[in-house]
A protein has these predicted regions:
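Surface-exposed, proline-anchored Ser/Thr-rich loop/turn motifs
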Residues: 296-314
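Surface-exposed, beta-sheet-biased, low-hydrophobicity segments with strongly acidic/polar composition
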Residues: 1-292
């Protein structure tokens, strides 16, 4: 149920609950990205209504709109393509999905309404009203209009973070990330599109951290210079493991090495050695720090990262 933020150089930087938030708002950058928490079973759908219809929406308007095929998902290839953003018109560079950027005022004005299915099964209507003066303004309510909340999230409260978080369940903001410059990898459950939306346990890299996957290779002798690094955050992802239903055990893909270029500019060799699954949530891996020429700077070391318990590194 936790999310661990990990520095290749300095180990775990934070290990926090991954079920206490519903929305995440981009703090740095210009995409005005807004994520939903699929790990917490939060589901997002377009309402198919104008913002002028906000007060007139009823439960009848949800009929046919909450089908699984209509679900909007965070993209697991980039932090900056959230569920609220993926309906953007690619032909309009000012369309950010939930709203449109005004070049004159430098504000984003919300032009879309959404239905959100909460982990409790409740249905909320959601309107991201604007982003102006570094503050997100948004509203949510029951679909019949009751229990409406109009609130804000200020970027200034989350300086140095990728995202600021909000819980609809408690009506509060959450500061749950370490500084964006202090971590390289996130270990957690997240939603992946697959052929259909599915919750996976895997590893996502931080923004500007590149990863190269080498497979099939000799794990001892492989050179990093033969493989092209990628900035897709799911390059490590979840497919380095698979569950064997015959033995009821997790199998780790052999002959697989990941080369991680971290926030500090160092290159690391990472080999996964185990996964605890639902038993303990542990990600087990071997890491080796490389110099700019690919020569080992220090001895390789095994690492045990627990998404639920604390990690231990030898």
């Amino acid at each position: 149920t936790n999310q661990a933020f990990y520095s290749m150089e300095n180990g775990e930087q934070a290990n926090v609950s991954n079920t206490d938030w519903d929305l995440a708002f981009q703090i740095t950058g210009f995409q005005a990205t807004i994520l939903v928490n699929g790990k917490n079973n939060v589901r997002l759908f377009k309402a198919g209504k104008s913002v002028n219809d906000w007060s007139a929406i009823t439960a009848a308007d949800t009929v046919g709109m909450l089908n699984p095929g209509n679900e909007l998902l965070n993209q697991d290839t980039s932090w900056w393509s959230g569920a609220f953003n993926i309906t953007a018109d690619a032909a309009n560079g000012f369309d950010l999905g939930w709203g449109v950027y005004d070049f004159a005022t430098h504000a984003v004005t919300g032009d879309s309404l959404f239905f959100m299915k909460m982990s409790t099964g409740e249905i909320k209507k959601v309107w991201i009203q604007s982003l102006m003066n570094n503050t997100y303004y948004f509203a949510y309510a029951n679909v019949d209009g009751s229990a409406e909340v109009n609130t804000t999230l200020s970027k200034s409260a989350f300086t140095g973070k990728n995202f600021g978080y909000y819980s609809i369940a408690t009506g509060t903001t959450l500061d749950r990330e370490p500084n964006k410059y202090t971590w390289d990898l996130s270990f957690a459950q997240y939603m992946s599109a697959l052929p259909f939306p599915y919750k996976v346990s895997g590893v996502l890299s931080n923004d500007s951290v590149s990863v190269a996957k080498a497979y099939p290779v000799d794990e001892q002798t492989v050179s990093p210079w033969s493989f092209t690094p990628s900035y897709y955050i799911n390059t490590i992802g979840y497919e380095w493991k698979a569950y064997d239903f015959n033995t009821n055990a997790w199998l780790i893909q052999d002959s697989t090495v990941f080369f991680v270029n971290d926030k500090l500019g160092f290159l690391w060799k990472v080999v996964f050695t185990g996964f605890g699954g639902s038993a303990n949530g542990n990600f087990e891996f071997y890491k080796e720090k490389l110099s700019a020429t690919g020569v080992q700077e220090n001895g390789g070391m095994p690492a045990l990262l627990g998404v639920a318990p604390n990690p231990a590194t030898n």
